[in-house]
Amino acid sequence: MNIYLDYIQEIEDRKAQGLNPKPIDGAELVSVLINQIKDVNNQYRDESLNFFIYNVLPGTTSAASVKAKFLKEIILGESLVAEITSEFAFEQLSHMKGGPSIKVLLDIALGSNETIARNATDVLKTQVFLYESDTSRLKNAFEQGNKYAKELIESYANAEFFTKLPEIEEEIDVVTFIAGVGDISTDLLSPGGDAHSRSDRELHGQCLFEHNKEMQKALSALQEKHPGKRVMLIAEKGTMGVGSSRMSGVNNVALWTGVQASPYVPFINIAPVIAGTNGISPIFLTTVGVTGGIGIDLQNWVKQKDADGNTIVDKDGEPVLKQEYSVETGTVLTINTKTKKLYNGGKELKDISTALTPQKMEFIKAGGSYAVVFGKKLQTFAAKVLGVTAPQVYAASKEISIDGQGLTAVEKIFNKNAVGNTPGKVLHAGSDVRVEVNIVGSQDTTGLMTSQELEMMA
């Protein structure tokens, strides 16, 4: 009980900072919530229900493990909660990514109760974050003749978790917001001095634009003025996202301008739209892909050339630029994902096909690159179990091979571990194929944020 009252006190303290209750990642607090939910006369029951449903972090957090077990009790009829039906319990499990929620769903799908096994199987068909313990269990059940295991593996082999997702909108309306002129560092988006708060996403969100409240208010006002449109954050006459705080920087931009990933998980947003006159920093652009976002190279200012093709400079030695089109704050633009062009009304401004490659379109559709990577792995597993060739669902591999050119150390590692590429073909930089990986290293981590990313990826 004390831990719950401590949480209530923390909520009051956060209110003074303009913050909502902090998402729960610990098992002990969730256990207290469950006890209070079970006690229909408990004075804290209503708010405990709300916290349990809408404020528990997913994945492999200890909180998610306790939540998943209680949802299983509800589905099996071992616990009765009027506000959480069996259907609603399945709905919540479907949003918990992987780890304990997958174990619970497999327990039910491979169990003896036909009705709920059917429901669990239908939910599992939408999931991609299965690990070796999960797939091994599924394979064993398949070999023992379990019909739902067979149905699941056939679904995974056809990658129905991807093919049955909603198609990407043909037109995405955005309204521009110039975050700065010149290169924009990740420090503007996620200052290094605020690194301590990066795992508390709502708190960290307050440091966007280096705590510039006027800019934050202007961004919010723009959103209120243009409901239904996404805000596109822009580096005018520069490159967006230079610097090293790429993940927390993208998290902050997504928090302010993106889409909530799940109604049951607060302050985790995806799909930000960002742009720069000179494009996006490569590692920042990759991280945008992790969240299923869009990064656009605007080229709305171009360097002027003289008759000999040399860049014209001003008295300060800076290149003279000519504006090709305006993206001043408040400009409404349309991203067409079919034509892969950027429009202002009916006027075509720019070909943006590099922002909407087949691979990047997959990330957008799946809600991020992790889901695509795990999905490909799951499809490969299922096809292997069935002894069939996996159908071509994802974008075809891109193989770049340059005759007579040697390999860098990284290219050698890449070639040694490539999967499904043309046999005997040597691949060079720019290739996009599957590789087998069993070790992941990082040269730069920020403690809690990194562990949180891993837990919520499940």
Predicted feature locations:
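Amphipathic alpha-helical packing elements
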Residues: 2-39, 360-364, 369-374
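Short amphipathic alpha-helical segments that mediate assembly, nucleic-acid/protein binding
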Residues: 4-7, 30, 45, 68, ...
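Structural detector for internal amphipathic alpha-helices that build alpha-solenoid repeat scaffolds
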Residues: 17-22, 46-61, 76, 83-98, ...
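Intrinsically disordered or highly flexible coil/loop and linker segments, enriched in small
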Residues: 20, 42, 419-423
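Amphipathic alpha-helical scaffolding segments comprising HEAT/armadillo-like alpha-solenoid repeats
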Residues: 27-35, 58-77, 98-110, 129-141
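Generic amphipathic, hydrophobic interface segment in small proteins and small subunits
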Residues: 34-51
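Short coil turns that connect the paired helices of HEAT/ARM alpha-solenoid repeats
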Residues: 38-43, 76-84, 109-116, 141-147
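Fe-S-dependent hydro-lyases/dehydratases of central metabolism
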Residues: 95, 108-109, 116-458
